[in-house]
Amino acid sequence: MTVTVWKYPKRDEWKVIMARPQMDLISLSRTVSDILESVRCEGDDALRRYEKQFDRVVLDALQVTPAEMEEGVAAVPESLKKAIRQAIDNIRKFHASQAIEVKKVETSPGVWCWQKPVGIEKVGLYVPGGTAPLFSTVLMLAVPARLAGCHEIVMCTPPGKEGKIAPAILYAARETGVDRIFKLGGVQAIGAMAFGTESVPQVYKIFGPGNRYVMAAKQQVSVQGVAIDMPAGPSEVMIVADSGADVRFLAADFLSQAEHGADSQSILLTTDRRIADLFPAEIERQLDRLPRREWVEKSLSHSSVVLLEREADLADFVNAYAPEHLIVHRADAEEWASAIVNAGSVFLGYYTPESAGDYASGTNHTLPTGGYAKSYSGVNLDSFTRKITFQQISSEGLKNLGPVIEEMAEAERLEAHKEAVTVRLQSIHS
């Protein structure tokens, strides 16, 4: 498999290099909307029908039972349980540090304002199964949801052919405090959480990655009264390397991203010709050892190495692309990264692989893709909260601020707004 190498491209060629694999959500729209409408109208009957059609499983009960939970938990090796608990601890520490103390501010004498974060009452988590059951996604979503104070955490994940959920997903859900787990995948799972059925409760916000059908479903329900975490597309990584970078590390990071899916994208940026020349051969060497080679090769078909002429161009290229993941293989990684303003999550130094953030460093792996890192943050504690503002004004405060409000209301010709202040001021002065 040959990775495309761009040598000293001009700036007007950057757009071509940065082109991402596109999901044609428009062509999926009718199929997705039909499934969503069926779930809205038919409830559990539609869910069972689509599970039989798409996941090839006949389900009596949609919700995971206590007995199924215990059976699944017992099947998880102790070594994996220990690793999951350590990851939970790190994720909890990092997200707990994001909590903000409520602070009252006196904006003018007698006028107090403050803001209070409140957990979203009902949230839905979508955890992909398919080619790789992503139990790590349970940790990334359920830990901050519980920290934020969400009252009900509902999770949907597709069952295997025997109608069972992957044991590691069940263990992760139990350890993070997920309230209810449903054996549902795809568009039908998103519809169930968005609209509610006889078995599945309706939620207020849906989180989690998925294939293009899941992404299209999330976008459709987001204009029907249900919030979603962010728009999302294929996963991606950009790697920046200096002359001191180890080409083995670079190739390993490049391939770990390609392993996410056939439409994932990896881009290596460097100004060092030796790195650019050695890299393709190292990719081939490591690729031969991967069991998912055929899957990874599809991703590599739209990945590339970019050899730039000037150091100053590196940060410009990164900020223009706005990668989901940015790995900085540089001796001056932290200093260099101070110029980065568009990225989902940044991994600094030679010994910080992206997989650390995917699993256990503590940061969240649910991140904006497709250039959305220019305008969206990754999932964090705030993602699971709403901020309610409060204000309280004393009689003296209204004396001070009232004339300002009256003047502005009169200028906007909103007499009732002005009168709401005037009647109070008259009461104070009488």
Annotated model-derived regions:
Residues 175-265:
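Conserved NAD(P)+-binding/catalytic subdomain of aldehyde/semialdehyde dehydrogenases
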Residues 105-171:
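Conserved small-residue-rich beta-alpha loop and adjacent elements
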Residues 256, 260, 268-343:
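A glycine- and small/hydrophobic-rich beta-loop-beta segment
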Residues 319-430:
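C-terminal core of ALDH-fold dehydrogenases
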